[in-house]
Amino acid sequence: MIKVTFIGAGSTVFMKNILTDILLEKNFSNCEIVLQDIDDRRLKTSNLVAEKVAKSIGANPKIIIEKNQKKALSGADFVILMFQIGGYE
C-alpha cells in the first residue's frame, strides 16, 4: 500500500487541496494517508476534513493522525511538507 505523509497537516486548507488531487488519482485512492502536526486541535480538524474529502470523491484511504514526526515518516513513499508563514504577533 502506498503511504503518503503530510507533515504540517494542521494547515487544513492546503492539506485538503493537495489530498483531493492525490485521491482523485486512481493509483492513490486506497492508499495510506498519515496526517502529522504538533497542534492536536488543528490535526483533529484536518482529520475530519480528510475523511469528508475521501467520502465525497468515493476514495477509501486509510487515514491516520500522528503527532510524532518520526512515526509519521516511517515507511513513507511520499512526504508533503506544509507550513503557514506568519500568524505570530
Set out the residue ranges of the language-model regions:
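Metallocofactor- and cofactor-centric catalytic cores in central/energy metabolism, strongly enriched
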Residues: M1-E89
